[in-house]
Every structure is written in C-alpha cells, then in structure tokens.
Amino acid sequence: MALRFPRFSQGLAQDPTTRRIWFGIATAHDFESHDDITEERLYQNIFASHFGQLAIIFLWTSGNLFHVAWQGNFESWVQDPLHVRPIAHAIWDPHFGQPAVEAFTRGGALGPVNIAYSGVYQWWYTIGLRTNEDLYTGALFLLFLSAISLIAGWLHLQPKWKPSVSWFKNAESRLNHHLSGLFGVSSLAWTGHLVHVAIPGSRGEYVRWNNFLDVLPYPQGLGPLFTGQWNLYAQNPDSSSHLFGTSQGAGTAILTLLGGFHPQTQSLWLTDIAHHHLAIAFVFLVAGHMYRTNFGIGHSMKDLLEAHIPPGGRLGRGHKGLYDTINNSIHFQLGLALASLGVITSLVAQHMYSLPAYAFIAQDFTTQAALYTHHQYIAGFIMTGAFAHGAIFFIRDYNPEQNEDNVLARMLDHKEAIKSHLSWASLFLGFHTLGLYVHNDVMLAFGTPEKQILIEPIFAQWIQSAHGKTSYGFDVLLSSTNGPAFNAGRSIWLPGWLNAINENGNSLFLTIGPGDFLVHHAIALGLHTTTLILVKGALDARGSKLMPDKKDFGYSFPCDGPGRGGTCDISAWDAFYLAVFWMLNTIGWVTFYWHWKHITLWQGNVSQFNESSTYLMGWLRDYLWLNSSQLINGYNPFGTNSLSVWAWMFLFGHLVWATGFMFLISWRGYWQELIETLAWAHERTPLANLIRWRDKPVALSIVQARLVGLAHFSVGYIFTYAAFLIASTSGKFG
C-alpha cells in the first residue's frame, strides 16, 4: 500500500476516517510524538526549522521594502512627512466600481492604493534611507539573506552537518554566543549604523558605501576615544531649531544624554538612541564572557544553580536539580523564551507610543494606534503560549525525583495557596470594579451624576509626581523645583526629560483621574483571572484532587467518562483554551482604554474621556457607538468612500467571530448526524455518487472543535477591532 498522510505516524495513516487528516495536521509539528523519533533527530528538526522561520521573516520584510519601492511614494513622503500619506502598495481590484477606484486613489498615486499604517516609512526615514533605490537595495539584500537561511536549514539536515545532542545542550557556549554574538555585536553594529549613516542623514549628509570612508561622523574622528576625552562626543548636539534631514540647526555630537524629544519630529534624539545602543552593546559583550567554556574560567550554570540555596531553608533545596531539568526539556526552555518574549512585546507596545523612536511617527495617529494594538495582541498570544508549554513540561518532562524539595517541587506542593490567592484577588477586583461602574451607571440614569463614586488615583499620581510631573501639585522628589535631584537633572542627566514629562503634546505620564482608576482595575481583573486560569492549568497538569493520574492522559484529553465526577474541561489544554478568551477580553479593555484616551487627547477634548469613562454606558455610547459611525458609513446610499474596506472588514470580522460559536456551543452528536445525512444523500444522488472518498467522514473531536471555535473567535475579534480602530482614527485624523 502506498504511504498515506501522515508519514510520521503509521498508526494514524491507517485510520479509516477523516480523523486521519485532522489529527495529522494537528500533530505535524509535535515532533516528540512522531514514529522513530530520537532525541538527536528532535533537536535537529527544531534547529533546521528555525532557519526556515528566519527565511520567511526575511522574505516578508523584503516584500515590504519591494512593494513600497515599486508602488509606494517614499521619495515624495520624505519631502513632506507630515502631509503626504504613505502608500503601502497598490490595490488591483478595488471594491466596487468607479466610486471605489476614486475613493482609494490618494497619496498622490495614479491609481487605487492602500495607506501604510505600520510605521515603516518613519522607520526607514529615521535610519537613513532616502530613495527608492535604497529600498530596492534593502529588499534584494533581505532576499539574499532569506535564500542563505533556507540553504543553512537544508545543510544542517545533511549527515555531515548535523549538530550532536551535546552541542544543543552546551548551555554556557549558547549563553555566551547569544549574549555577546547576537545582542552585543548586533547592538554595536547598530550603533555603528546610526553614527555613520543615520545621524549624518538626519543632518542632511547622504552617506552610502561610495563615500562611507570619506565622511567623518564626528569632526575629530576617533581622537577623543583614544585620548580619553569621551565627553567631547556629547558636545554641540542638534539645537531645538534643528530641521530633521537638513543641516539647519544641526550639531556635531554623536553620543548624547539629552532626554526628551526632538521638537520638530517629536521623537527621541537620534544621538541619545545611538548612545543607548552603545551602552547595551557594552553590557552584553561583557555578559557574554562570563560563562565557562573552553578555558576553565567563568561561571558554570550548574554550579550557580546548585549554590542557590536560600538561607534558613525556607525555600527547601532552592535551585538544586534545575540545571538538568531545564537543559533536558525543550518545553521548559520554550516556556521561558515565550514568557520573556511576551513581556518584551508588551513593553514594545507601551514604549512605542510613549517614547517614539522614529521621526514624525508620533504625529501619525492611526499608525500609533495600530502599532500599540498590534503589539498588545501579539504579546497576549505569546504569553498564553508560555503557560501552555509550561504545562506540557510538567506532563512530559518533569521528574519528581530529580527536583525533590526544590523551587519547582515547592510550587506544586503549595499550588492550592497560589490558586486561592489568585482567585481571591480576581473576585475582589471583579466585584468591586463592576460595583463601582454599575453604581455610577445608575446614578447617571437617574439624573444625579453628582452621586457617582469617583476615586482619585492618588498613589499613581504621587508616583507620576515623584518622576517629575508637576500638574498635580504634590511638590515631591523630581517635581519639587528646589530639590537636589531636580537641579542635577537640569545639567547632568537628560535635561530635556523633565520638560517632556510636563508638555501636554505627547503621551508621557498622561494626566489620570477616576476614569483611569476604574479601567485600571478592570484591566487588573482581566490580568489576574487570565493568570489564575493559566497557572492553575499548568500546576494541575500532572494531577488534581478530582483526577490524580491526569499526567497519564497527556496534555489535551477531552474527558474520562462519567465515573470521575465529570472530568471534562480539566485537561491542561482546556485551561489554555479558556485563558485565551480572558486574554482577548483583557486586551480589549487595554486597547479600548488606550485608544479612547488618545483620541480625546489628539482632538483636544480630554474632558470627554474624563467624564464618560466612569460608567459603562459612557464607554458603550461615547467610545464604541460614537466612533463606529464613520466606519458604518464606509458604504452608504451616496456611494463608497475610502473607509469602505474597513466597513467590509468590520462586518466580515463579526461573521468570522460569530462562526466560532457554531463550534463552541455545540455537541459532536449533532455534527455526526448532519454528516451522516449529507453522506447518505450524496451516495444516492446521480452524478454526485460517482465521486467516492477514501475516508469515512466523522465529526471533529471535542478538542478539535474547540480549537476551530477558538481560532474563529480570536481572528474575528481582532479583525473587528482592527477595522474599528483604523477607520475611527483615520476617519478623524487622516
């Protein structure tokens, strides 16, 4: 018999039903479960797939550059970044008819185009790109890197080039390589690019390979470095009247500590950014020489962890046994990586709007909103994934003997206390926050708004004041104009920083009040509940009171029959599945809050947010309903306008989202009967009965249907909000 899909599981390949196809797709990347897998092949497959991932990333970014160079308006945007709308790419078939063609022909284009809300124009402009030729060069270079990555992936699967398991488990060498080689050297290289290309570019000098060695980024070159006069590199920075991209008002400094924002571009000073990357490079280059490899000097990770035994024995044996546990579990390593990456991604969202690094991006409001929302959603999915792989670690890789009485074992031992504390925090936050919102709703409804319970966030305001915000009148630490820290800040460190905090034109330390207090606690409720579900799922993955032998059933089992008091919904997979809904819910509140607060800030009517955000009806009426009107008018009796694509996506997103419920609120029996009926009709219909299928159609398993439902729910939810966000922001600000 010919080999059938999936080749990696002969048991599954012989399944006579359509389960073969769906289970095959579901387990295609679960290399550990494949036939004939060895530890060596497992590591090699994952290693090779990393190169494939890199190839896809380089190809995608190459495509961005290529399409903007081919169909965009980068060169005309560079001449006037605040008034020309950046074009992402052309639209081949605008829907529908001539009105759509006219509506989407904008940004100085000859035909219908999409506007770019990704910030790539601002990014490329800031780092020194100026012409379409620059963009084409970048696209070709990334295409070349993509090809190299594919070749490297293939090469490392060939017998002579396969790394051994010991190579993959050499933690110290990997740490040194990643810290020094990846973070250190790349940060140093980026500092070099900023100093040699981007900073001269911001001062009107066009540096490329042909004049790279002739243009000194600093008049005295490397002289001050070798004579120890490093402070010279910070002298004569760009003036506050500097026009970005020209020599007007430009200085000569390359590494500064100015603080605050460039007055024209509203972004961080490029010379501050270069200084930051140089400092990061130094720290990581040092860090990458700390671990013991060939020369017998430096730290051994195992020795470090074995020595981590807390005094007094209150945490048992501390980190004993952790080295081998982590080093032998790819799920543990992936969980750690995802947790770190998730936090970093959320930090990127927070910092991209509050400390914009790219020239003029702060004045492109739709891009600001899109990037914040994009990075928060990405962070949510990555963070939930960390707990999923943490749970798989406990089921597949955790060895109780190896971890006796260490911090891991102790987490499992007192999991009841962890869950009950999280549960208490979630209940407290939920009932109190909802109680305040609903009370305020009722007061508004009865015409007595003065009876609302409005709580000033005095502690948060005090923290903002301590960092230099003066408007609250606390007169404490950096907001106290006669304190030593304040006076030092005037001259020594970041003199522009305190000015930036107290300007009302940016997103630093926004003024907060009772509406912020309430939504902050609503978000805290979402975070604590999501965490509770995820932590419970991971800590109960091996067993719970109801099902002590849970680990024998694997990560994602549907049920274990009626005899266990109802064991549906208690696999670690179910916890992940439920947590994703809460994660989406929480990020909904986060993005609603961010967007509404910023819309009112940008429009100059912050009182709308302050007055309407203290009760639920205010959010529904003055944020959601009021801002969806432009969107819904994308198509109207008078024809099509440029928001029509978002109106269509808004409707389509709702459709996808609603489709999810067909899979989420349903029973397998219903689907099985429907399938049997359709198959019966098919087999008895002339012509149709000439086509036979090899596999007997069966309904999806409970877990599979939940996954399909969850995917539709998530995608529809994000599509709907993305359309709302972009249309409501671009409809107001262009």
From Swiss-Prot:
GO BP terms: photosynthesis
Any Gene Ontology CC annotation: photosystem I
Cofactor binding note of this UniProt entry: P700 is a chlorophyll a/chlorophyll a' dimer, A0 is one or more chlorophyll a, A1 is one or both phylloquinones and FX is a shared 4Fe-4S iron-sulfur center.
Localization terms from the record: Plastid, Chloroplast thylakoid membrane
Keyword terms of this UniProt record: 4Fe-4S, Chlorophyll, Chloroplast, Chromophore, Electron transport, Iron, Iron-sulfur, Magnesium, Membrane, Metal-binding, Oxidoreductase, Photosynthesis, Photosystem I, Plastid, Thylakoid, Transmembrane, Transmembrane helix, Transport
Membrane topology category: Multi-pass membrane protein
Reaction(s) catalysed by this chain's protein: reduced [plastocyanin] + hnu + oxidized [2Fe-2S]-[ferredoxin] = oxidized [plastocyanin] + reduced [2Fe-2S]-[ferredoxin]
EC number: 1.97.1.12
Protein's UniProt keywords contain Magnesium: yes
Record carries keyword Transmembrane: yes
Residues noted as binding chlorophyll a B1 in the record, renumbered to the chain: 654
TM region(s), chain numbering: 46-69, 135-158, 175-199, 273-291, 330-353, 369-395, 417-439, 517-535, 575-596, 643-665, 707-727
Function: PsaA and PsaB bind P700, the primary electron donor of photosystem I (PSI), as well as the electron acceptors A0, A1 and FX. PSI is a plastocyanin-ferredoxin oxidoreductase, converting photonic excitation into a charge separation, which transfers an electron from the donor P700 chlorophyll pair to the spectroscopically characterized acceptors A0, A1, FX, FA and FB in turn. Oxidized P700 is reduced on the lumenal side of the thylakoid membrane by plastocyanin.
Description of how the protein assembles with itself and partners: The PsaA/B heterodimer binds the P700 chlorophyll special pair and subsequent electron acceptors. PSI consists of a core antenna complex that captures photons, and an electron transfer chain that converts photonic excitation into a charge separation. The eukaryotic PSI reaction center is composed of at least 11 subunits.
The name this protein goes by in its record: Photosystem I P700 chlorophyll a apoprotein A2
